């Protein structure tokens, strides 16, 4: 039973149901110091009803309460403080972790419901920059978390492969491009053309108009325009898939904006039939004043569609195809207004399922405090950064463990894992500065620090060379360090649920750091391999810790090497 539930039931019985179990569970607190117990109930809540001071109420409850399952229950001022039965709790938690293994913390909350996750979405014909990392790894981690809770995540790469920028790129290719040069080095050469034509279009309206015309041709199915565009797309995907391979990220579908180009007319017609489209300066809009939003521009004066038109078609397609219980969009915070408009237009059209669409925004990655911008050519390629992280990891592993057999493979797991972990430990709505020195450090709140704790446990278990009997686990928790680990292990299922509820992988990353820290304190304080009556209990404790560390890392898409 959950410890909050245990405390809440005992309290509700002690106060004759004046507050229900759920009401009590909602106000249970954790004392600032473990010396004051594991959980605390503030008696202020009962003062008005019972017409007594909180201090008196706390004292009466502490005397009356059934202490089964607790080491002791005491009144501390206006609080009732609960000390869990450490030995019984430890045995129960460790047995549960060792029995369930990687499935510890699994639940069937989702009951198999489909959850499309719109993620990654790099623009074709542009480098896969560090700026694309966040959507990719946050989306991948959320998918793993949701799968653990019984949902069916569907990872969709909504490639940026449609829009006026491709009309401009075709313009640049026709003016300056050389097929052989581009074939030899596709992304770099296309980036040069893109930066060059954007600078020209800013200065010369005719260049901008030419790009607009080429995009219009794409929308109208012009053979030449689509042939060039398809070539841009094919060479881009080769590069993207190589990078996804390094990141260890897979997708269920690659469906770019272009996939929906033949599905937009139906949604525009639907809006028209529902009298939601209004003309404004020759363009078609949906008025969203009642939502305190600007009008949504659905079609421009020249008939060209916009980002929101394509997203309306996308949302309708996903509902029809996947019948989702939730549809997530892992897209930067700068698009918040766009998603408000998108949901409002669907709501106006009578699609109440739009309530199940969730924008999962995130903060920006900078370097040296500067934003990455493809238009201006300020790009740091993610692949180069990953390769550099792996090199740095390998040098540190060489220094720590020169005889390690599979050094190169471990360096990849540590280097790539370090970059992913650093991103995911950052609160999703916050940005961060991309700093490889900090990311790949084996000290501090980093991926390598957590991986090293896991590898250290594996090393101890190999040295012990002893099978633990799950049915006969008995751990005498006589030190604070062991108790901190037990409490952390007990909390893991709740951590997973909280991460899912908040679409926040950082909750799991921070948990992994604190569990690794708790283990390292225990390791420094206790002779784990001392051959005494408690040896099996200690081995069971660290074995359970290893299982949960590995699973926490897996949920973040980070490997857990056995040796480092």
Curated annotation (Swiss-Prot):
Chief place of localization: cytoplasm
Keyword Translocase: no
Highest taxon listed in the record's lineage: Bacteria
Keyword Nucleotide-binding annotated: yes
Keyword tags: Aminoacyl-tRNA synthetase, ATP-binding, Cytoplasm, Ligase, Nucleotide-binding, Protein biosynthesis
GO CC term, one of those recorded: cytoplasm
Motif 'HIGH' region boundaries: 122-132
Location in the cell: Cytoplasm
A Pfam family per the record: Arg_tRNA_synt_N
Gene Ontology molecular function, alphabetical: arginine-tRNA ligase activity; ATP binding
Cross-referenced InterPro entries: Arg-tRNA-ligase (IPR001278), Arg-tRNA-synth_N (IPR005148), Arg-tRNA-synth_N_sf (IPR036695), ArgRS_core (IPR035684), DALR_anticod-bd (IPR008909), Rossmann-like_a/b/a_fold (IPR014729), tRNAsynth_Ia_anticodon-bd (IPR009080)
EC number(s) stated in the UniProt entry for this protein: 6.1.1.19
GO biological processes: arginyl-tRNA aminoacylation
Subunit annotation: Monomer.
Name recorded for this polypeptide: Arginine--tRNA ligase
Organism: Lactococcus lactis subsp. cremoris (strain SK11)
């Amino acid at each position: 039973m959950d410890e909050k539930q245990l405390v809440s039931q005992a309290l509700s019985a002690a106060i004759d149901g004046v507050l229900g179990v759920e009401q009590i569970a909602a106000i249970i607190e954790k004392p600032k110091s473990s010396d004051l117990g594991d959980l605390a109930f503030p008696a202020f809540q009962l003062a008005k009803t019972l017409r007594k001071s909180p201090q008196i109420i706390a004292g009466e409850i502490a005397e009356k309460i059934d202490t089964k399952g607790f080491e002791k229950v005491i009144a501390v001022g206006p609080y009732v403080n609960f000390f869990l039965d450490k030995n019984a709790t430890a045995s129960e938690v460790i047995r549960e972790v060792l029995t369930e293994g990687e499935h510890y913390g699994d639940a069937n909350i989702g009951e198999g419901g489909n959850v499309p996750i719109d993620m990654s979405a790099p623009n074709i014909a542009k480098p896969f920059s560090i700026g694309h990392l966040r959507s990719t790894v946050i989306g991948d981690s959320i998918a793993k978390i949701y799968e653990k809770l019984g949902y069916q995540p569907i990872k969709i790469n909504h490639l940026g492969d449609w829009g006026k920028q491709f009309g401009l790129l075709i313009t640049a290719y026709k003016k300056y491009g050389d097929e052989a040069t581009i074939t030899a080095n596709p992304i770099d050469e296309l980036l040069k053309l893109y930066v060059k034509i954007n600078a020209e279009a800013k200065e010369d309206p005719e260049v901008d108009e030419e790009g607009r015309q080429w995009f219009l041709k794409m929308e109208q199915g012009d053979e030449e325009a689509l042939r060039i565009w398809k070539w841009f797309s094919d060479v881009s995907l080769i590069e993207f898939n190589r990078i996804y391979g390094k990141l260890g990220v897979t997708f269920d579908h690659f469906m770019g904006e272009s996939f929906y180009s033949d599905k937009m007319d139906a949604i525009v017609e639907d809006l028209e039939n529902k009298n939601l489209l209004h003309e404004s300066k020759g363009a078609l809009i949906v008025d969203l004043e009642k939502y305190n939003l600007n009008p949504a521009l659905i079609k421009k004066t020249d008939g060209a569609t916009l980002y929101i038109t394509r997203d309306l078609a996308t949302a309708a397609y996903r509902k029809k195809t996947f019948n989702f219980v939730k549809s997530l969009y892992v897209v930067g915070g700068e698009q918040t207004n766009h998603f408000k408009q998108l949901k409002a237009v669907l709501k106006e059209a009578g699609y109440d399922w739009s309530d199940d669409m969730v924008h999962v925004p995130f903060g920006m990655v900078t370097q040296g405090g500067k934003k990455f911008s493809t238009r201006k050519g300020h790009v740091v390629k993610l692949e180069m950064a990953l390769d550099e992280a792996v090199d740095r990891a390998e040098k540190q592993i060489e220094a720590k463990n020169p005889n390690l057999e599979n050094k190169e493979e471990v360096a990849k797991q540590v280097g790539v894992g370090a970059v992913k972990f650093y991103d995911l430990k950052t609160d999703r709505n916050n940005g961060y500065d991309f700093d490889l020195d900090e990311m790949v450090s084996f000290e501090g709140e980093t991926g390598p620090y957590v991986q090293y704790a896991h590898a250290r446990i594996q090393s101890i278990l190999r040295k012990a060379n002893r099978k633990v009997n799950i049915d006969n686990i008995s751990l005498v928790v006589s030190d604070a360090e062991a108790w901190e680990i037990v409490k952390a292990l007990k909390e893991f299922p709740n951590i997973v649920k909280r991460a899912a509820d908040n679409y926040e992988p950082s909750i799991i990353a921070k948990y992994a750091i604190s569990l690794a820290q708790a283990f390292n304190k225990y390791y420094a304080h206790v002779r784990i391999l001392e051959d005494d009556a408690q040896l099996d209990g200690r081995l069971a404790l660290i074995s359970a810790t290893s299982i949960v560390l590995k699973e926490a890392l897996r949920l973040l898409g980070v490997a857990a090497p056995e040796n480092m």
